[in-house]
Amino acid sequence: MVSSVLPNPTSAECWAALLHDPMTLDMDAVLSDFVRSTGAEPGLARDLLEGKNWDLTAALSDYEQLRQVHTANLPHVFNEGRGPKQPEREPQPGHKVERPCLQRQDDIAQEKRLSRGISHASSAIVSLARSHVASECNNEQFPLEMPIYTFQLPDLSVYSEDFRSFIERDLIEQATMVALEQAGRLNWWSTVCTSCKRLLPLATTGDGNCLLHAASLGMWGFHDRDLVLRKALYTMMRTGAEREALKRRWRWQQTQQNKEEEWEREWTELLKLASSEPRTHFSKNGGTGGGVDNSEDPVYESLEEFHVFVLAHILRRPIVVVADTMLRDSGGEAFAPIPFGGIYLPLEVPPNRCHCSPLVLAYDQAHFSALVSMEQRDQQREQAVIPLTDSEHKLLPLHFAVDPGKDWEWGKDDNDNARLAHLILSLEAKLNLLHSYMNVTWIRIPSETRAPLAQPESPTASAGEDVQSLADSLDSDRDSVCSNSNSNNGKNGKDKEKEKQRKEKDKTRADSVANKLGSFSKTLGIKLKKNMGGLGGLVHGKMGRANSANGKNGDSAERGKEKKAKSRKGSKEESGASASTSPSEKTTPSPTDKAAGASPAEKGGGPRGDAWKYSTDVKLSLNILRAAMQGERKFIFAGLLLTSHRHQFHEEMIGYYLTSAQERFSAEQEQRRRDAATAAAAAAAAAAATAKRPPRRPETEGVPVPERASPGPPTQLVLKLKERPSPGPAAGRAARAAAGGTASPGGGARRASASGPVPGRSPPAPARQSVIHVQASGARDEACAPAVGALRPCATYPQQNRSLSSQSYSPARAAALRTVNTVESLARAVPGALPGAAGTAGAAEHKSQTYTNGFGALRDGLEFADADAPTARSNGECGRGGPGPVQRRCQRENCAFYGRAETEHYCSYCYREELRRRREARGARP
């Protein structure tokens, strides 16, 4: 029972009232008080307190709720042997207090990162899971044995788009995923083959322990906050049985970088990096009493690629790190290599004692993240794999794969070329290691997604020459590898004769290759049939045995010694998709079994046993990989990820997280709605305040204002009057005479002060943009137009109509734009001054209509932007018998601006041009 694991606290509320002071809390003191008041384990107490940001009252409340949880909510196996019947197993209050430092979440960004993941959905459940995992990892028989677990994200496709996006932002390192995908390092396999699942990087705490955090997340779904993996890493490097062998492998890989006197110092520094001690140390009493101010999150030393290799030995499973090869600056230029990417195998542990499913990590911006897949409704539709090659089908680096041996003399044997040659791993040897430690598979790439270079060629053309050259290169590579691996024995004439006989026999059997290849490719089979030679025989052996085990090749029985291998391989291979191998079913000899003799495949290989060192699986992988390097990219060489094994608390953690995420998502949506409503209310209030404001004065009375140039593009909208002539000078003079009788006092003052042309507008007319103002065709009895200041900002200085900005004027378009029936109304003279109410009606007759920029609204009384607004209207005198001065279109043809009487009804620019033209004309007279 959970209630038996968690004793009943005595006077919890009293303790909270006495001890809770958020300004002077010391975390060690709070932890001690919590343990003293509840009797809980320090690990559980610490998780509860950290989950509530060291709020003692809230942590005690969570503890009380946890006690009331029914046993059915937790697996029964965890409570075995933990009840009050065995008091000797109950932890003491001082147990596990010797931690490096207590973590606090003062930093808001760090707190968000630490509190948003699955591992913080329920601190109590995660603490129980951590304790269970720690008990499994401390098994007496295998002190470093780790159970095979692989974490998977829940299926998010069942949720709405908004909630799914919220969870992805909450759990996934978006920056890492985008960077690695754009670099072509991550999820390129799901692009070329839809049957492969995408891998997503989980958000990981960046405190220097991100490598172990990422490994813990990839297996169990929570961070390594108890430093279980970190301490195991340090212990293995310091006192582990594999210490010397690991050191030799590390030194061999670093041989070209260090000098002899630097080795011990480098190894000591490397050992210190793995320590579980943080960079910053604090006393247990929190310093001088100000625990909150003097304490901070511990930051650990960043780990290197060798620590990944040691971690593979601790977990006893391969580790694949997906990373870019070069570190780039902000401009994308590469300036430093990134050595982390590649494959790390537990080479110092026999393959039969290792887990074959690799742990996959991502590395970007000096930070590790766990790469996990997502559950699917139909698990058979997509498979979780990790390619062992890059997108160019080149094998990933195999780190620390060479051990020179105990008898290697550093500084002496380094110059022995013969001994160095024995230690160089060929591609064949690397593939053999991968087949030994992992479940490898070849995934067929659909023809429609293959790269152009990898498209199958026509089997009827002369493409056989290319295939023959490929076969020759494979034969030469095989010969070189065999001669290198068997350099002590050499290759005598008898072996060469056997090789020749084998090639002749392979040619006679080439007719059946296309039928026996299955998923390999019919096109490639036809090429092999033409003149493949050695490669056809290499593939023939494996596929023939697989088909015979499935009952598809009964007429080609093999030797008796291969029957066991045939039955095993036949049950594994699928003819339609891929061919995979398992380490538990290997015919490949492990590194520890090579000295005992040849493998079953070598013994049953007939005349090829001595000439070929590795199994048929390795031969097939080598041939396909070589073909991929030559352009025949039809398969992806990948390792299978086993996702069926999960720890007992996986479902509870996922359930708690989804519930918490739904609550946070609902709160976020509600906050957004409130913010939107507040913004809308503020906008409405601002609009109302703008409408109530007094009209703006566009200019100071008596001072001319320079005309404004439109901010829009330099496109001119004009009215070309081809059929009807523009108003002549006589009409202009009549209009000026009429305008003089209806001018307001303010207008007269302006005219008196502006005796000359209005300065200010210097750009030429074609580079300007404006709005067409057209006078009404007749007198209308309507109310005075609102002031300019009361209009919307978008209508105050209207833009040019977008639909006409890119096309020239035509009479048909002009007819649709104008509000008058004839062009003569544009030149209609204004009648004389009208007394009293007649003046008001006359002013209303000449109100202008404005076309705004795309709004389609006609604004009465809105004057042209380049012209001065009537003083009477700006002063609010509308309707009081004071009509403003009348403006007319510029007399110059094709000019869309307006002029005043003092400028002879030219616009200011045209008026200056007209004056200049007149001066030039007078100067040209004899």
Swiss-Prot record:
A Pfam family per the record: OTU
Q: What does the entry give for GO biological process?
A: protein deubiquitination; protein deubiquitination involved in ubiquitin-dependent protein catabolic process; protein K11-linked deubiquitination
Q: What is its main location?
A: cytoplasm
Zinc finger intervals, A20-type: 884-919
Residues the entry annotates as binding Zn(2+): 890, 895, 907, 910
Q: Where is this region: TRAF-binding?
A: 168-410
Localization per Swiss-Prot or TrEMBL? Cytoplasm; Nucleus
| Occurrences of domain OTU (ranges) | 199-374
Keywords in alphabetical order, please. Cytoplasm, Hydrolase, Intellectual disability, Metal-binding, Methylation, Nucleus, Phosphoprotein, Protease, Thiol protease, Ubl conjugation pathway, Zinc, Zinc-finger
Spell out which residues are annotated as carrying Phosphoserine: 119
Span list, region Disordered: 75-99, 452-514, 537-613, 668-768
Q: Using the record's annotations, give every residue carrying the modification Omega-N-methylarginine.
A: 880
Signal peptide boundaries: none
GO CC, any one term: cytosol
What is annotated as the active site?
Answer: 207, 210, 367
Function in brief: Deubiquitinase, which cleaves 'Lys-11'-linked polyubiquitin chains. Might be required for PA28-20S proteasome assembly.
Quote the protein name from its UniProt record: OTU domain-containing protein 7A
Its source organism is Homo sapiens (Human)
This chain is encoded by the gene named: OTUD7A
